[in-house]
Design a protein with these regions (language model features):
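Alpha-helical scaffold elements within enzyme catalytic domains, especially in hydrolases
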Residues: 50, 136, 175-176
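Generic structural signal for well-ordered alpha-helices
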Residues: 83-84, 130-134, 170
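N-terminal secretory targeting modules
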Residues: 1-32, 36-43, 49-53, 85-91, ...
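Catalytic His-Asp segment of secreted/periplasmic serine-dependent ester chemistry enzymes
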Residues: 149-231
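Conserved SGNH/GDSL esterase-like catalytic core that processes O-acyl groups on lipids
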Residues: 26-30, 36-128
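Active-site segments of SGNH/GDSL-like serine hydrolases
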Residues: 98-102, 133-166
Length: 231
């Protein structure tokens, strides 16, 4: 009984970390992913909050700390730890999507990760979990912004060993975006100046409020620039 109550409380906590939305709601931008998007949500300083401020419109943020693409547990996965299950039906013009970092860091320790990366996305960007999910989103009529990986400032960090995998994932997601004009890859490789710790929290993994704001501004610019071309 205690175990069941613990699981129930955990799922309730995860559910409370994501925004709910009505299908008839006014928001047209949906954000999904892991802690890079979810961090600072409670304080109003997340990436999505920065997008809202830049564009002057609502963003529904369904991202969850620790979320992965490969997540087998059904209950907590449905609560958002499985990125694909963060999706909610709606008239989304835009979906902002990140993820895969936890699958690499926690799944293979940024060591022998070739197979894990291939399962996420193939070298040509055409196959894998990420292209499959992006294809589903495109079929629903949404344009997709794929966020690249936030680099460390070049100092000792728990994820410093993941740099090669992050670079390779960026290359593959860029190729995916080249296949479809409705998919936009946003590289974050130049967000953090070398040696500048101010774009990260003290763990040197997650973006600080400053880092989240910068990412959000860049997301908003992609939306603004793309929509200006269609007017």
């Amino acid at each position: 009984m205690r175990f069941i109550l613990t699981i129930t409380a955990f799922v309730a906590f995860l559910s409370g970390c994501t925004e709910t939305v009505s299908r008839d709601g006014p928001a047209r931008i949906l954000a999904m992913g892991d802690s890079m998007l979810a961090v600072h949500g409670a304080s109003g300083n997340s990436v999505s909050h920065a997008v809202e401020q830049a564009l002057g419109e609502d963003v529904i943020d369904r991202s969850v700390m620790g979320a992965k693409y490969f997540y087998a547990l059904p209950i907590s996965g449905s609560a958002g730890l499985n990125i694909r299950k963060q999706y909610v039906e709606g008239k989304w013009d835009w979906v902002v999507l990140n993820g895969g970092g936890n699958d690499i860091w926690m799944g293979c320790g940024c060591g022998r990760c070739d197979n894990r990366v291939d399962r996420l996305i193939s070298k040509d960007g055409r196959r894998g979990t990420i292209p499959g999910f992006v294809s589903e989103l495109r079929e629903k009529g949404s344009q997709v912004i794929l966020l690249g990986y936030l680099r460390t400032p070049g100092v000792i960090s728990p994820i410093e060993g993941c740099r090669d995998e992050g670079d390779e994932m960026d290359r593959r997601m860029s190729r995916l975006a080249q296949l479809d004009r409705g998919v936009h890859f946003l590289s974050l490789a130049d967000v953090v100046p070398h040696g500048d710790r101010s774009y990260h929290t003290v763990d040197l993994i997650h973006p600080s409020a400053k880092g989240s704001t910068e990412i959000g501004k860049r997301v908003a610019e992609v939306i603004r620039r793309t929509e200006a071309k269609t007017r």
